[in-house]
Amino acid sequence: MPFKVKVDILDLNIRTGAGTDYAKTGEHTGKGEFTIVEVKAGKGSAAGWGRLKSGAGWISLDYATRLA
């Protein structure tokens, strides 16, 4: 089930897959609220990786706060 997260850093990398072993897309989230549609465990993030609804890629949930 999709959920929203808040990102408070400007330069959170978006990656092509769920882990630091996947390439960076060259894009960053910026600060704001984003919808996560899938979560997977992966290298480099204790909280897991979230797939952005926009289709842009995956972000580390270590740097995102889940919203109610």
Model features per residue range: what roles?
Residues A18-K24:
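Short alpha-helix capping/helix-loop boundary micro-motifs
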Residues E27-Y63:
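SH3/SH3-like beta-barrel superfamily modules
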Residues P2-N13, G17, V37, I59-D62:
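Catalytic cores of transferase enzymes with a strong primary signal for eukaryotic protein kinases
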Residues M1-N13, G26-G30, S45, G50, ...:
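SH3-family beta-barrel domains
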